[in-house]
Each structure stands twice: as C-alpha cells, then as structure tokens.
Amino acid sequence: MSDGEADNGEPADARDLFTWLSREVHELVSHVPRVHGAPRPIQFLREFVSANRPVVVTDAFNDWPAMERWSLDYLADAMGDTKISVNVTPDGRGDALLSTRGWTVSGTGDDEKTPDEVFVVPEERKMTMREFVDMLETPVGDDHGDVHPSHRPPVPYVSRQCGSLLEEFPKLVGDCSHEMRFASDAMGKAPDAVNLWIGDERSETTFHRDHYENVYCVVRGVKVFHLLPPCDGRLLGYREAPAAKFTSSREGGTFGVELETPRRLVSWASATPASLRSRACTVPEDPVVPIVVEVRAGECLYLPAMWYHHVTQARDERGTPAIAVNYWYDMNFDDRYAYARFTQEAHARFGGESTPR
C-alpha cells in the first residue's frame, strides 16, 4: 500500500489517483492480442478502435507482391536513380534528447551559453536507394564503444514521414497498397499518410505518441514496440530542451549539433524501456512497465492514437533489415482525447513527476 492509499485499496489523495489509474488500465489491457486474418471492419471498430486497444493482425496482407519481391537489391533496382530522403544519425537515435557534453554545438549567439541538453533530429540526406543500401550494409566493427558518438559511423534510416511512400517511392506503391481496407472501412476514411520505413538494429525511435490511428505492416525483419497507454505519460520523464539537428562533415566523417534559429523549446521523453523496468523495481507500489510486442513479417500492429511507443528493429534470419509500411488515419478528437488531456493537465498540477505538455 502506498502512503496515499487507503486500507481498502482506494486512492486516498490526488497523487495516488495516478497510480490507481495506471493499475486499472493495465488490468484492462495487460497484453496485445493476436488475430488471424484481416478482421471484419465492424469487429475491428468494436473490439479495438472503440476500445482503444492495440492488436496484432497476422496474414492480413499476404497478397501484396512486396511479400515476395522486396529485398534490398530489388528496391535499389526498382528505384534506379531516383533520389530519396534518408535520415542519418551517429547513434541511431533520431528525435531524441541529447547531452551536449563532448559535442561541437553551432548556432549559439555571442553571449549565449551552450545548452547542456538539446532535442535533436536527424540530418536528412538525399541519395539513391542503391547508395542507401550500400551505407546500410557497410560492415561496422565492434571497436566504437569507447569512441564519442560524434566520431562513429553514420546510421542511415529511411523514416521520412507525412506520406513518404506516395511522394518518394511511387514505383513501389504497386507492390503494396494505398490503404488497409479493413481499417479504412472501419474508420470511414482513407489514410492521411502512408510511410515507408527501412532500417536495422542500430536505429531506435524514442518514446512518443501520435494523434493518428496507426496500422503498421512489417514486410521484412522484426519490429519491437514498447507500448504504454495514454495515462502513463507521467512516467516518461519529459524535459524541455532547445531544438537542434545533427550535421556532419562528409570529409572528416564527424558529426556536430546545430541549434535551430530562432530558438524553439521542445518537450520530449527521456525515459527508456530499461529505465522504466528499473523504476518498477525501485517503486514497487507503482510498477508500470511497457507492454512489449514483436511484429514480424506478414503481421501488422494496430496502435491506437495517443498510445506512447518506443520502437526498435532487427534483421530476419536471412539478414534482411526491417522493411515496413504504415498507415496513419486521423484520430477522432472525441471524449477520449478530452479525458487524456484532463489526465495530462491534472498530473502536471498535482502529480509530482514530469508529464507531456
């Protein structure tokens, strides 16, 4: 029993309400179910979208030609000389908080102190798919552990959002689909954006949430999602930091950090799956840990809007990196959104831990 919890298990004060809420939600959604084959739209809407519950759907897109065709060589040949956008980082972490210790930071004013921490986004480079594949498949030794990240080999990741499949990869659209029919029929609309993702085990997406219903289809490799429901944003250690981006010296191969001008503060999560597991051991009265979901080739994950997620990936048994297509459907800004906003604002005032703003 926590200090603020009554003998009957009910919350006794405002702060303890948040622990109680997490416990209630995790009892309702303790795991992510798996269903075989594309569900009927009414079933998908009733059991998962309306219930705000993630689900893995297996064998939902076996008819895609991509399931047979997509290899790195095929993608490179299909795209030819077309330039694509590739996000490049020194450590695989794009859109993340970064300590500036040991980094060369540019963009500070004459009288401005270098910030201790920044919110950094990847460097975006234009290259052909073949050049991306060559960079991705260049062997990387194990002797970089003691080297500062600014001097490590670049980690490329095809991860541009807001409709990258249709905008940058039109030659690949015929290999998959412009929508997931069961999801479009259930939600009564086409997806707002369809994105292509290609990366290996070095790339990591830090905890965040989206205001989209997300249907994430894995064609090759494995995607590993760590999920938290909307009520658990309080645990993610949000901090504000100035916005910045990675820059690199192509000749010397070193990375630096460039601050945005004018200055812009971004609130972002600092927690990791490992830090949340550690916290659960040291705070046993509030032992929240993420739900871990592996999504393999031929499977898709429905990730409800506003659920927090951290994503990594792995190669398959043939050594092919993770290749995926995801569909973003605009969420309905209904009472669920209002409840999530209320919880967020209440915790910011009474909870004692950081929360997204």
Predicted segments with their positions:
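N-terminal accessory scaffold of Fe(II)-dependent oxygenases
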Residues: 2-300, 308-357
